[in-house]
Each structure stands twice: as C-alpha cells, then as structure tokens.
C-alpha cells in the first residue's frame, strides 16, 4: 500500500512535468537508449528454501520505436538480492547477484496529456542467470553457488512524461514472474518501484 501511495504521488508530479514538455520532433530516430533503476521486495527460492528480502536492480536497454506509441527493448539487467532475517533453516544472511537479458514490448495505453504524458504497459520475457550466490548460516559457515538459469516474464505499468524532444522520464510499478528454472536458485521480484530515463536519438 505504501508503494501504491508513493506511485500515485509520483504520477501526479510526472503529469505536471509533461504539460510543459515540447512537441514531438518528426525527425527523431527510431533508436534510443534507456537507463533505469528499481528497488523493492523479492523472493529467492530453490533447494527447499524460500527467502523473502529486498532487491535493487539496474538496467541498460536499447529501444527501437516501431511507432510513436510502441517500442521494443532489449539489453542487460542486474539484480542484487539481500536477506538478513533468521529462517527455519538457520540461514541468517543471504546475498545473490543475478544478470538478465530481457526482450520486451512497451506501448502506450492512454495519453494523460496529448503528446506529453502517457500511461504505458510493458511485458516480455527475460533470461536470468545467477553469477554469485552466498549463504551464511548460524554457525558462520559459508557456501557459494553460481550458474542458476531461469526464465521470467517482466511486467510493468507506469507513467512516462516527455521532458524534451529527446528525453523521457518514467516511473513504473514492475514485477517479474518466474516461469521456468533449469537449475537451483530463482529470484522472483515483487512490488518494485522503478525510475528510468530514456533518450531517443
């Protein structure tokens, strides 16, 4: 509920920014880049474990604008998971790093201010791999695992506002639903609040 309240406040702020943005430039390229970061709750599962914790993510994406209201994206995402609570399995500290390659489509659902701000929906598929996984148990022993591969479906809804002809600012609520795991550990994101800046060439 707190995330939803923050999101509504951000939505109102972004809408006000969009009102003062410039009109579209018909000479813009179909290509662009996007840099984003998110934070929120996540669950790490695998090998009979189900650990709830916090995650922070960064992403670097390339965008192809098929139309003014729809774009395709791919790139690299990196997720950091941490959990510091005692569980029934006596694990009290968990850290994991995952890298992902998404392929998704983002399209405008409705315009809030014509050609200035819009509500957007994003959905796709993402291949993820654990590049580091570490557990610390109650007796201070440690174990490290890597190589876990799993597929997920990233979903997001948010609001985007044009700051200028080239720059767009976006705020989103996002998640990743895990669909398949080929090896041990999987990371499922829940209730992420994401901010991103896009630049269209």
Report each predicted region and the residues it spans:
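Cleavable N-terminal export/targeting peptides
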Residues: 1-29
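Short glycine/proline- and aromatic-enriched beta-strand/turn motifs that initiate or cap beta-hairpins
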Residues: 21-65, 200
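Short loop/turn motifs that connect adjacent beta-strands in outer-membrane beta-barrel proteins
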Residues: 22-31, 68-70, 110-119, 163-167
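Residues that define the transmembrane beta-barrel architecture of outer-membrane proteins
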Residues: 29-31, 50-56, 93-101, 117, ...
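Extended hydrophobic secondary-structure segments that form protein cores and membrane-embedded regions
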Residues: 34, 119-125, 172-174
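Gram-negative (and chloroplast) outer-membrane scaffold detector with strong preference
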Residues: 39, 61-138, 198-201
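Predominantly the C-terminal beta-signal and adjacent terminal strand-loop region
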Residues: 79-86, 96, 144-146, 150-201
């Amino acid at each position: 509920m707190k995330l939803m309240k923050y999101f509504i406040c951000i939505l109102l702020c972004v809408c006000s920014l969009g009102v003062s943005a410039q009109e579209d430039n018909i000479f813009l390229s179909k290509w662009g880049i996007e840099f984003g970061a998110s934070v929120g709750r996540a669950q790490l599962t695998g090998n009979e474990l189900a650990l709830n914790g916090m995650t922070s993510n960064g992403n670097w994406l390339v965008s192809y604008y098929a139309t003014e209201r729809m774009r395709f994206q791919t790139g690299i995402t990196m997720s950091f998971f941490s959990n510091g609570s005692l569980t029934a399995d006596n694990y009290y500290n968990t850290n994991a790093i995952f890298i992902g390659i998404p392929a998704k489509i983002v399209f405008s659902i409705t315009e809030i201010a014509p050609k200035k701000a819009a509500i957007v929906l994003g959905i796709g598929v993402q291949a993820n791999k654990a590049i580091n996984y570490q557990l610390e148990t109650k007796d201070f022993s440690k174990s490290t695992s890597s190589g876990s591969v799993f597929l997920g479906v990233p979903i997001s809804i948010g609001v985007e506002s044009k700051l200028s002809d080239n720059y767009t600012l976006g705020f989103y609520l996002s998640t990743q639903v895990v669909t398949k795991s080929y090896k041990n550990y999987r990371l499922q994101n829940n209730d992420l609040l994401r901010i991103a800046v896009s630049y269209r060439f």
